[in-house]
């Protein structure tokens, strides 16, 4: 590189325009839900159809049919959870954290949607309510319900902790959780870290802050299609004692608490249809990425091969 390229003040006087979000929703865009409709769905009478408490440092999966409401709460106080979502009938369609981050924000809240991978690209679930929505941006730049990071896993733990072996990181908890549905480790994917506060420091480095949730805080989702969801109660608990090393798991268990999951159906089975709601559909792109597929060996386009 030239001296000019390495000059410390090279970009000192560069004028940078005020940035505009890359994906601003237009009228009728699927990025901008009808808040009146979704608010009415959240407030409509509902019937409990499934309920369980997820113990500390464990994982569990459950089904949520299209139109059902999933409520996740902190029954005993602050606790971080790592959430995965799949199309119930096709696990190759799963939550796409990075695209969701682009379409919405680095941290999610009410009316944001969890989008699926290509070639499907549709909302799997939409956040109906968030009791921590008022948290906003704290003095360190942290926000809640994180999409910047991903799940903790035994591989990075072994690398950073001199070969330490621990089997109950969120990745492992999710792997065990989905096995009864025929899914494997490769099906576990980047997560939505619910109730987790994160951000980037002045050097652009990822940080985590203690969970702000209190007893009874909640996050609710509307299933936009039939989904399989899986949740891990993070072994870091509320992250107030987060760390790596031989003693880290023994320390962090002191701040671990359960999470509670409830699945509801609306009492009025026609309510969603009357509101104009329909299950989400895959992206309408039907092209071939510029390719032409031959009809057979006698096709003129392939005769020279």
What are these regions (language model features)?
Residues 2-305:
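Acidic, Ser/Thr/Pro
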């Amino acid at each position: 590189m030239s001296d000019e390229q390495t000059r410390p003040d090279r970009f000192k006087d560069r004028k940078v325009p005020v940035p505009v979000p890359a994906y601003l929703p237009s009228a009728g865009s699927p990025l901008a839900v009808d808040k009146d409709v979704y608010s009415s769905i959240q407030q409509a009478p509902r019937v409990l159809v499934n309920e369980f408490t997820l113990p500390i440092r464990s994982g569990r999966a459950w089904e949520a049919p299209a139109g059902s409401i999933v409520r996740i709460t902190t029954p005993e106080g602050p606790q971080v959870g790592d959430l995965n979502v799949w199309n119930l009938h096709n696990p190759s369609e799963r939550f796409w954290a990075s695209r969701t981050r682009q379409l919405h924000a680095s941290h999610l809240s009410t009316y944001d949607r969890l989008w699926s991978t290509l070639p499907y690209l549709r909302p799997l679930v939409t956040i109906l309510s968030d009791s921590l929505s008022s948290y906003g941006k704290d003095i360190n730049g942290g926000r809640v319900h994180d999409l910047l990071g991903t799940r903790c896993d035994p591989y990075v733990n072994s690398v950073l902790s001199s070969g330490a072996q621990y089997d109950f990181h969120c990745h492992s908890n999710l792997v065990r959780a989905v096995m009864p549905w025929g899914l494997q480790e490769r099906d576990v994917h980047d997560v939505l870290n619910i109730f987790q506060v994160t951000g980037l420091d002045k050097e652009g480095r990822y940080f985590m802050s203690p969970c702000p949730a209190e007893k009874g805080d909640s996050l609710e989702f509307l299933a936009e299609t039939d989904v399989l969801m899986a949740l891990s109660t993070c072994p870091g608990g509320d992250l107030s004692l987060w760390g790596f090393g031989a003693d880290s798991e023994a320390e962090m268990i002191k701040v671990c608490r359960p999470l509670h999951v409830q699945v509801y159906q609306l009492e009025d089975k026609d309510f969603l249809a009357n509101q104009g709601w329909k299950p989400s559909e895959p992206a309408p792109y039907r092209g071939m990425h510029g390719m032409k597929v031959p009809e057979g060996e006698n096709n003129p386009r392939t005769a020279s091969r």
